[in-house]
Regions:
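Interdomain/boundary linker segments immediately adjacent to catalytic/signaling cores
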Residues: 1-68
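Basic, amphipathic alpha-helical patches used to engage nucleic acids or provide basic targeting signals
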Residues: 125-145
Length: 198
């Protein structure tokens, strides 16, 4: 049996890590099935997608909390194609970006647009290598449109990928992990972008 203090500590842990939101919003109806692996399944692609969705569920509340606490003039859009900005914000966007989907798009004052992409790698392989190159290209396309790019990534899969993570750190303006995002660096970057004169 857990003590009241242990229960409070578990509740705090679930809230701070985003697990509360994750379990409340997950697609399965039974946590026991999820934990025993029935819902998670053996399909690698589905598992990768699920880890990406889990990262969105962890990072989304961090972004919302920053915007609310600092009263930042950002509208937060989740899982939208850039075409959405043309249709709903009357922005001009290059055709190369129109059909690209973003984890998060923040639309700020004076059309300050920030694309935040998140991912988590639990294992090594070709995916971390591919993602670095694709996000370098994404940032370049965004910069051509006057937009900003933030990449939040984490996971043990990066441990054996030092060259790739170094490449990302050198070529991407705002690469973060969850620790830095939670400890104020994401907040600092979002405030800095609003003050940027571009």
């Amino acid at each position: 049996m857990l003590s009241n203090q242990e229960i409070e500590e578990l509740i705090t842990f679930f809230e701070r890590t985003g697990l509360t939101d994750y379990f409340q919003n997950m697609s399965c109806q039974n946590i026991q099935d999820y934990v025993t692996g029935v819902e998670v399944g053996l399909d690698t692609h589905a598992r990768k997608n699920r880890s990406g969705e889990a990262m969105e569920l962890v990072v989304g509340p961090i972004i919302q909390e920053i915007v609310k606490r600092r009263n930042l003039p950002y509208q937060i859009e989740n899982q939208k194609y850039f075409r959405y900005l043309v249709d709903h914000y009357d922005l001009e966007i290059s055709t190369s970006l129109l059909n690209r989907k973003a984890d998060f798009i923040l639309v700020g004052d004076k059309n300050k647009i920030v694309n935040i992409e998140v991912n988590f790698f639990s294992g090594t392989g070709s995916k971390p290598q591919e993602i670095v190159d694709s996000y370098i290209n994404r940032q370049n396309e965004l910069l051509e449109n006057g937009f900003y790019f933030i990449w939040i990534t984490d996971g043990f899969g990066w441990k054996g990928q030092k060259n790739q993570i170094r490449k990302g750190l050198e070529m991407i303006d705002y690469p973060l992990n969850l620790h830095f995002a939670r400890k104020g660096l994401l907040e600092k970057i979002l405030c800095q972008i609003l003050q940027d004169s571009n």
